[in-house]
A protein has these predicted regions:
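GST-like domain detector, emphasizing the conserved glutathione-binding G-site
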Residues: 1-128, 245, 255, 262-264, ...
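N-terminal short leaders/motifs
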Residues: 2, 6-14, 208-224
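Preference for short coil/turn "hinge" residues that link or interrupt alpha-helices
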Residues: 36, 170-172, 238, 284
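A short, terminal or domain-edge coil/loop segment
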Residues: 85-94, 135-143, 223-236
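Histidine- and/or cysteine-centered catalytic micro-motif in compact active-site loops
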Residues: 187, 226-229, 256
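Mixed-charge, Lys/Arg-rich low-complexity intrinsically disordered regions
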Residues: 214-247
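Generic structural signal for buried aliphatic residues
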Residues: 251-253
């Protein structure tokens, strides 16, 4: 069975969510480090220009959005608690809020001089300006309500207080972690660890929980090149789909919140939780791109 390949960069919160899951699941995995913003030629080739990071690959199957990546990790590792669709509605509602409203509040609350200096230090001054311009342009096209700095801080502090109240056990919904823990973790990792906000000082349960989450580590990834990843895709064929395949209608699919660059392909599978489209090129051969159903808009293309 092919190993999972993760396309990510160090400062990406959602990449940290998946890296922590990989540490918890104890899966071996391959790593391809990509730029903080487009152009990303390897993802243009494999994911049709899908612009959010991380993206995962296993052979000729490409997984876009952390929900489909998490479901694949759950399947490969035999840890069903990592798949959102396996959770009760209470957990699913928590994850939806943590992955959008709380995440955006964490990013805005973290955006100060310290975070800017860190970005410059880990990339370059010119790359930082390009990154900021890219994120400003992405924000202008977003369909989510932006919050200001003070409101973002209040949201994050309220979130921390909620976690403090929830943590009567080692993890948010019981004695062992589930997808909710990883969804809550990555935003606080960004605002408290990377940006250095001291907002966990009066939240001992959350601080201890964060330490437990960090202790999972990232496993032992092996770095490969973008060319290696493309070669693996070209030499593989997509995994067989479950019964219920679609007819191959030309479609575009795009996130409905932000980073809404559409990806085109042929619809080959759809159910209550995911959509799969096919794409093909001489460079990669036939690929199947997997997207979550929720939060994505599929538009049929007419001649």
């Amino acid at each position: 069975m092919a190993e999972l390949t993760l396309f990510h960069y160090a400062l990406s919160p959602f990449s940290e969510k998946i890296r922590a899951m990989l540490g918890y699941s104890e899966l071996s995995w391959l790593s391809v480090t990509v730029r903080e913003m487009p152009p990303r030629p390897v993802l243009e080739a494999l994911a049709g220009g899908y612009r959010k990071v991380p993206v995962a690959q296993r052979g000729a199957d490409i997984f876009c959005d952390t929900r489909t990546i998490a479901s694949e990790i759950a399947r490969l590792s035999g840890k069903p608690e990592l798949a959102l669709e396996n959770q009760p509605e209470e957990v699913q509602a928590f994850v939806r809020k943590a992955d959008l409203d709380i995440f955006l509040a964490c990013v805005i609350a973290a955006s100060d001089g310290r975070m800017l200096r860190r970005l410059i230090r880990e990339t370059s001054l010119i790359n930082t300006f390009r990154f900021l311009k890219d994120r400003i342009n992405m924000g202008r096209k977003a369909r989510v309500k932006a919050v200001r700095g003070a409101e973002a801080k209040r949201k994050v502090l309220d979130h921390i207080a909620d976690l403090e109240n929830r943590l009567s056990q080692d993890f948010l919904f019981g004695p062992t972690p589930c997808i909710a823990d990883f969804s809550a973790y990555h935003g606080l990792w960004f605002v408290c660890d990377l940006a250095g906000k001291p907002w966990l000082e009066n939240a001992p349960r959350v601080s201890a929980w964060m330490a437990r989450m960090k202790a999972f580590g990232h496993g032992s990834p092996r770095e490969i090149t973008p060319e290696d990843a493309i070669a693996m895709a070209a030499s593989a064929t997509p995994e067989p789909l479950e019964p219920g395949a679609e007819s191959g209608t030309p479609v575009t699919i795009a996130p409905s919140d932000y980073g809404r660059d559409p990806v085109s392909g042929s619809l080959v599978y759809s159910d209550d939780t995911k959509t799969v489209i096919s794409r093909s090129s001489p460079k990669t051969g036939l690929l199947h791109l997997h997207f979550p159903k929720q939060g994505f808009r599929v538009v049929e293309q007419t001649a």
